[in-house]
Swiss-Prot record:
GO terms for biological process: proton transmembrane transport. Keywords: Cell membrane, CF(0), Hydrogen ion transport, Ion transport, Membrane, Transmembrane, Transmembrane helix, Transport. Pfam families: CGL160_C. This is ATP synthase protein I. The lineage of its organism: Bacteria, Bacillati, Cyanobacteriota, Cyanophyceae, Nostocales. It comes from the Bacteria. It is a multi-pass membrane protein. It is found in: Cell membrane.
Length: 122
């Protein structure tokens, strides 16, 4: 279980760093409004990642399968963005997907580092 918590902390840290870099880049190259929309989506992605981690943590002890209620978070955010004129759907959605970019970075890093003990396990 300790490895799970370390992985979770690493993924959250990478997500937050990536969010900061992309937020500043979007603010510089586009506008503050679009950057804030991205940040809203990225924060929702971090909350989604946290909910997923709690769900996985309970898996096996209390539950037999993962719940689908986490997707309601994204649906509510997209619905809010479509109703409120100040919010834009695309930057919010791309911000939400930041945690997916974190997962891709982690997998590529683990796959190409041959000294990783995770790769030596059968």
């Amino acid at each position: 279980m300790q490895e799970f918590y370390q992985l979770y902390q690493e993924l959250v840290l990478i997500t937050l760093v990536l969010t900061g870099v992309v937020f500043i880049s979007v603010w510089i190259f586009y506008s503050l409004n679009i950057a804030l929309n991205y940040l809203l989506g990225a924060c929702t992605g971090v909350v989604y990642l946290r909910m997923l981690a709690k769900d996985v943590e309970r898996l096996g002890r209390e539950k037999q399968s993962l719940s689908k209620t986490r997707l309601a978070l994204l649906m509510a955010l997209i619905l809010l963005a479509s109703r409120w004129n100040q919010l834009q759907i695309m930057p919010i959605f791309l911000g939400f997907l930041t945690y997916k970019a974190t997962l891709i970075i982690y997998v590529v890093r683990v796959a190409f580092i041959s000294d990783s003990p995770k790769l030596r396990q059968p």
